[in-house]
Amino acid sequence: MKAVIIGNGAASLAAIRSFRKYDKKSSITVISKEGGNAYSRVLLPYVLRGKLSYEKLFLPFSDKLDSLGVTYIEDEVLSVDDAESVLKLGKHGDLFYDTLLIASGSKALWPPIKGICQPGIYHLWTINDLNRLQIEFSEKKEVVIIGSGFVSLQAAWAACSRGLKVTLIEIADRLMPLVLDVRGSGLMAEQMSKFGVNVYTSTITEEISKREDGKFFILLRDKENILADFIIVGAGVGANIDFLKDSAIEFARTIPVDNYMLTNVLNVFAAGDVAAGPSVFGDEHVTHALWPTAVEMGKIAGANMAGQNIRYDGSLNMNVTQMFDVTVASMGKFNDADIDDYYVYDAESGKGYCKLCYKDGLIVGICLVGTSEAVSLLGKLRPIIRNRLAVKLPPAKLDAFLNVRFFQK
Amino acid sequence: MKVITLDTSKCVGCRNCELACAFINSKETCERKFSMIRVNHYIEEHAVIPMTCLHCEDPWCMAVCPSGAITRDPETNAVIIQDEKCAGCKMCILACPYGNIHFDAELMVSHKCNLCEGNPRCVGHCISGALNFEEIEDFNERSRKKVDLEISKYMKQTCKTQEVDSNGK
């Protein structure tokens, strides 16, 4: 059998290892458009901050694909002929497959702002972006960051730690809506201000232009304009699926897959940022574009490509990082519209701001702006949320319950 | 394969294990924040539970680590975190369903039990025999014997009742 994987990231590597667990013989071919060894996009901000050295970016096994019996091709997939099971590649011609995994990941998007596409304006998404930003970071003094997602805030933290003057512009009325609830966002904004970051929320960027002295001039609607030496943009991601245009593989913004990571075509799987799979909350097709989800999906897809029949229980969104001296983490549902009850731990619990969220009597999520100790509570809650276990206990007693539960048969 | 086993019915909550662990990890102090094993006290529930890494067969922390800092030691079979590779992102803490990974706020890296390279100090300093470092087979053997004993007690009980019943007729 001939297995082919498009992409060389978290989902792809997880799939390779899981495939090899069940099938030691079949050939695996990995096609990477970006080229080079597989690395972790999650870690780019850490390298930029100086916390990790450059070579730590690369994933384990990324340089050992040979030993896993993988043929590695650096090329672009132009199209998929699903009727004949053939990929058309840019330089390498046609490539036949018996089973295909699409794990081509996502790319950072440019928001519709006049003048956004010019030298000196970056994403923080690829190793290339990192290399160019490293130069800017060491030579320049003022940075403007547009967008307030997870990556943007980590970029802000990196710039702040390296002594740059940072201004953050967010179009919505609060920071990180996908990671924090309203109060958490507010606390994060306060914390950033303490570190000297200028945070602008509800702010629309009208136009960016370059002045003669090389500085960027950023025109804001109804606010005073600002200047910057360079700009980092984090305005969401889009799946790399252009090559699916002429195939019968169904897709919208991402590719819908079932609990077995199978697309609508029988021998084509999808995993990671390109896939929209089931969630633990019963949604049929959700794309998280998160690292842990990519690993889980890749693992399932790899096993099923090797002939197994393993069902995915659904993904559970989870985020965590440390920035501006606080730990930010969340899991499941935590926005007011998705929950009907909540509990906020008091100061004595030593957690910081930690909100436990309920819906129909079940714990459905949690979000945290606080201490690293509190993160372990999120870990312990994961099986509770996943398996929809009802906990009939006051939240203050939850820690005890979770620790004792393990020993009760 | 040797593992640390916990018998919660024996634990007296002396927290010696924490002190021993803190000392071997910090090299200089017995401050509990340096300990990888944590004894949880629950007065109302009448429970004292020492918890440390279970070195899972299929560790989710290891699968999810974005920097590949978590590996399995081929000699001791321990799941270990390599400090120099850890980015400090805390994904593993979020992943562990037992809350057994901790954060070192000074080095800004995750920390966990590494089985002290095959000589776990927590077990050495346990005064009640709640913690043991033993072959998994020996542990299974003990569990089985315990269950056998329960069953035989139960059987005896039922036989007696039946005798009484039949005599009473």
Predicted regions and their residues:
Chain A
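FAD-site-proximal beta/loop scaffold in flavoenzymes
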Residues: C117-S138, N225-I300
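Residue-level detector of alpha-helix initiation sites
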Residues: G9-L13, G35, A108, N128, ...
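Cysteine/selenocysteine-centered motifs that mediate thiol-based redox chemistry or coordinate metal-sulfur cofactors
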Residues: A390-K409
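Glycine-rich dinucleotide-binding loop and its adjacent helix/turn
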Residues: S104-R162
